[in-house]
Structures are given as structure tokens and as C-alpha cells.
Regions:
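N-terminal small-domain helix-loop-helix segment of the aminotransferase-like
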Residues: 1-83, 90, 274-275, 396-398
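Generic structural signal for small/hydrophobic residues in well-ordered secondary structure
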Residues: 22-25, 66, 78, 102, ...
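PLP-dependent enzyme catalytic core of the Aspartate aminotransferase-like
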Residues: 72, 333, 341-342, 347, ...
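Conserved PLP-anchoring active-site segment centered on the Schiff-base-forming lysine
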Residues: 94-116, 143
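Helix C-cap/helix->beta junction micro-motif
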Residues: 119, 187-188, 301, 356, ...
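Active-site phosphate-binding strand-loop segment of PLP-dependent enzymes
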Residues: 130-207
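Conserved core segment of the aminotransferase class I/II
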Residues: 214-288, 292-300
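Conserved glycine-rich beta-strand-loop-beta hairpin in the small C-terminal domain of fold type I
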Residues: 270, 286-295, 306-336, 366-371
Length: 398
């Protein structure tokens, strides 16, 4: 049985009532009219889209557009899903066996660890740690975890799951670290699943890593139009892999879920992918401007917050400095009772929502240190919300 999805339950409760969403991971979206304006001649094609079932693996033309994002896969090595979440559920249902070792970077988007756990896997966390001004995912720790697998005795290969750029920290491995991870997986015959939904939003494009499906025969790349493209409403995600047998097994599971994607969504997704450069450039600019504003804000308030700038993606993960003890303290009422009696991000989040209509995401939604909280960089309204927050903190004498 699946545990409650803490992050999604939090958003279900607050996302559509909060005035300012200062913690969302998707970038600024657009209307259908705006999307069609990028390719006016496509409007007739949308109007003539047949509203019957679509091909279960995805419209061939859409899969061809997706494959063009990669160097080593073609349209037959792409499997379209109704968003990335369905892809996660279907993939792990196809792959995971009772007692199999699944190593997952931590913290993580909950389904990356919870789905394997619910399917009977032995889930081992691979920890990101703040180290010398960056969030570090240590390949040496992965090597140790893979060694633990040797004693598992299930006969199934280990599965390594990582997310780059990382949610919620914005971490990115160096190319040398990435190559070491791939090499470790090759040596152990591990399947490497990489959640690449924030790819193309690297702060410095030179830090962009290859897609794992391009560099490793057992690599599986997961992506979606929700994040870098900002088109979450289309509900189009996909898996790309050289291992067609894995995609075939996953497609069999998909028959029990969505079966196929929405025909209008596939048509609109094709338009978006043909104009990826324009759409992603717009969202990259929004993220870059917001990152600069947040960096100034945290520099001015370094007595209150610890700040490690993200190297990529549309989220970051600051930490409260002030509060009782180590900052892990959460009072029973989940209320902020004063500067000297302790402060948790959950308590701060509650007060910001009640008084300002600003939504931040507490680290406890990642089963992590509650002094941390997630902020989002991809929305235009972030600057206005940050100004309001800054003024409010001044009024509190902080």
C-alpha cells in the first residue's frame, strides 16, 4: 500500500487557494492561444484532431519530436505517458521484484522511492549533503550501496535512481562525477533511471549533463513537458531508453493505466517541442531573474537563512538558521511562537500562508530536516511575492 504523498497532499490543499505560489517546480505556463501563436498554421491541425483513441505508445510524430531531444534513441525507443508520474508508476511496476535493491537519491520526489518500496523493493537512500557551498551526491557512497546489494541474493540487478538537475536542491553532478556514476552502474549491471524533468534549465548551460539514455545501454531517461516547458496541463511525459525490452514491459503495464494519451494534448505537445528553444529560453530567463533576486534576498538575510544557490532546475532549498537547538525543532501546535522559542519551516509556511497568501513548501514534505523549505524560481509572480515577504520580515524585526 502506498503511503500518503506528502508533497502532493500539501499542494492539493493549498495550491489553488494561495495568492502567491512561491514554491512550485513548474515554470510559467501559457494558454493554448499563446502556444498556437508560435505556429499559427497548426491551428487547423488542432481543430481537425480526431478525438478517438491514440496509439498506446504515443503518436509517432510526437515520439519523433521527443527522440530529437536525444542523441542515441529513435522514436521506437520513446514511450509516451500521461505525465511523468504515470511513467514512474508504470516503469517500476514493470521492473521491480520483491526484495530487489533500489538505490534512490535523497531527498527526492516521493514517488521515486515510495513506488519501489510499495512494490517490495529494498530501498536504500543515497544522500545529498551540503558540502563546501554545493549540494553533493557522492559517487563513493553509491559504490558502497552497490556493494551492499551484493549480499541481497535476489538475482535481480540493482536499480539506481537519480534526479538531475535535482529537486529540491538544484544540485547537478560534475561531468566527472556523472561519468563515475555511469561507470559504477556498468560494472554492476545496474539499471540507471534518471529523472531529467529539469534538464535544459541549468543555470550555466555548460553544466548540462548528457541524458543517461544516450550514454548507457541500461540507462532510462524520464522527462515531461511540465517543468522546463511549463506545460503541465498537457499531461505529456515520456521514457526514453535503448532497452526496448524494458519499454515493452512498461507499455504492458500502461495498458492497465492510461492506455493512451490525450489526442489534443499530443497535438499541442508536438507544437511545443517544435518550438522548444523559444519556450525554454523564456522560462530560463524567468528562472535566472528570480534566482538573482533570491540570491540578493538571502545575502541580505544571511543571519536568518542558509542559502546554497541551485546549479539548475526551477527550485531551491534554503534552510532557516534561527530557532531552537539545531533548527530541527517543531512545536506541538506547528505555530511560530517567537524568534527565541524555535522556528520550523512548517510553522513559517503556515504563517506566511495565513497572513500573506504566500505558499512555501516545508522540508518535512520530503521527510527531511524541517528547517529546510523549497522555493520555486519559474513563475513571474515570484518577484512580487519576494518583495512582500521581505517587507513582512522587516515588520517582524527579522
Amino acid at each position: 500500500m502506498f503511503k500518503p504523498f506528502e508533497l502532493e497532499r500539501y499542494f492539493a490543499k493549498h495550491e489553488f487557494s494561495a495568492r502567491y505560489l512561491l514554491c512550485t517546480s513548474d515554470c510559467e505556463s501559457m494558454s493554448i492561444r499563446e502556444l498556437l501563436s508560435l505556429e499559427p498554421e497548426a491551428e487547423e491541425g488542432l481543430h481537425s484532431t480526431w478525438l478517438g483513441y491514440t496509439e498506446s505508445r504515443g503518436n509517432p510524430m510526437l515520439r519523433k519530436e521527443i527522440a530529437a531531444l536525444y542523441d542515441s534513441v529513435d522514436e521506437d525507443e520513446v514511450l509516451v505517458h500521461a505525465g511523468a508520474e504515470e511513467a514512474i508508476l508504470n516503469l517500476f511496476t514493470a521492473l521491480v521484484r520483491q526484495g530487489q535493491t533500489v538505490i534512490v537519491n535523497s531527498p527526492c520526489y516521493q514517488s521515486l522511492s515510495e513506488v519501489p518500496r510499495a512494490l517490495g523493493a529494498r530501498v536504500l537512500p543515497w544522500h545529498l549533503r551540503p558540502t563546501e557551498g554545493r549540494w553533493f551526491l557522492d559517487p563513493d557512497e553509491l559504490a558502497e550501496l552497490l556493494a551492499i546489494h551484493e549480499g541481497g541474493g535476489t538475482g535481480a540487478p540493482p536499480i539506481v535512481v537519480m534526479n538531475m538537475p535535482h529537486n529540491p536542491t538544484g544540485a547537478i553532478l560534475t561531468r566527472g562525477e556523472f561519468d563515475r556514476v555511469v561507470s559504477l552502474c556498468e560494472n554492476r549491471g545496474a539499471i540507471l533511471v534518471c529523472d531529467e524533468v529539469y534538464r535544459f534549465l541549468e543555470t550555466d548551460p555548460r553544466d548540462r549533463l548528457p541524458a543517461v539514455c544516450d550514454v548507457y545501454e541500461n540507462g532510462i531517461s524520464l522527462s515531461v513537458l511540465s517543468k522546463a516547458w511549463g506545460l503541465a496541463g498537457l499531461r505529456i511525459g515520456w521514457l526514453a531508453a535503448q532497452r526496448r525490452d524494458i519499454l515493452d514491459l512498461t507499455a504492458q503495464v500502461k495498458d492497465y493505466n492510461s492506455i493512451c494519451a490525450s489526442a489534443p494534448s499530443e497535438t499541442l505537445a508536438g507544437i511545443a517541442l517544435r518550438h522548444s528553444d523559444e519556450i525554454i529560453a523564456r522560462n530560463w530567463d524567468i528562472c535566472a531573474n528570480n534566482l538573482a533576486a533570491f540570491s540578493r534576498f538571502f545575502a541580505d538575510r544571511e543571519d536568518m537563512f542558509e542559502w546554497i544557490p541551485p546549479r539548475g532546475g526551477s527550485v531551491a532549498f534554503p534552510r532557516l538558521r534561527i530557532g531552537g537547538g539545531s533548527g530541527w525543532w517543531v512545536n506541538a501546535e506547528r505555530k511560530w511562537t517567537g524568534k527565541d522559542s524555535g522556528l520550523s519551516a512548517a510553522a513559517l509556511a503556515e504563517r506566511l500562508l495565513e497572513e500573506l497568501g504566500i505558499l512555501i513548501l516545508p522540508g518535512i514534505c520530503y521527510d527531511y530536516d524541517p528547517a529546510y523549505f523549497r522555493i520555486g524560481l519559474g513563475r513571474k509572480q515570484a518577484g512580487e511575492a519576494l518583495t512582500i515577504l521581505d517587507q513582512w520580515l522587516d515588520a517582524q524585526g527579522l
